[in-house]
Amino acid sequence: MKRFKIEKEHFGYKISEYLKEVQNYSGRGLRQVEVFLDGKKVRVTKQIKRQGILKVIEKEKETNIKPIKIPLDIVFEDEDILIVNKQPFLVTHPTKKKVDMTLANGIVYYFKEKDGKDFVPRFYNRLDMDTSGLIIIAKNSFAQAFLQNFGDVKKYYMALVHGIINEDEMTIEEPIGRVGDSLRREILKDGQYAKTHVKTIKRYEKSDVTLVECELFTGRTHQIRVHLSHLGHPILGDKLYGDKPDDVKRQMLHSYKVSFVHPRTKEIKELEIGMYEDMKSE
């Protein structure tokens, strides 16, 4: 439930207009709520004529994701946002081939135990199974719509790549597309625009490996993996895009930092976590 204080400057708004223009609800989100003005249920088409308290209750959505107890590393949680540090080798969301033992199953279980309710995980971002790090989950449709439209979400990754990158910084702008039904993505002239900024953090001369920070400006599937491979510096352990044999058990890619505008406070929230031990190269 959301609670908003109606002030004089909101007089004349329809409730739907107030929720969209002032509180950043989406049109779709308004179809999933019930609203109460000073305790009385009203329609969203009602015009605001006096000060008061507006309560917005979201209708519960159903989920077919089975609750399964899976350890969660919760980095941040409030009434709108949940952020977890996903461990490597864990699928984010059920697929046709993997229907349980995913992060989504664990999140549904967490809220079932905590609140006794069925929870629909609204993932803002997802990570490949072998990629570790921060995942943002909206806890309601209001937060989901705000993050998508006004959240100014920034995502930063650490990656260990083959070879020594001589440049200290570079920006890669190469379109990415899918060829046929293959899982693999490639640089294609008619692909979707994709932009990644790469900053060199440390060069490991002895092991011929470079640690880089990657900031995503777009969110294409496998974007960092494709762009770094295109540079000639595939990520260690990347079996799909790497052309150099190694004995690394997973791709060395970690979502280590996110920042976003919080949907309720409108303040910038930034969170950062360290890398897993397997990425701490010598």
Task: Locate each region found by the language model.
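RNA pseudouridine synthases
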Residues: 1-282
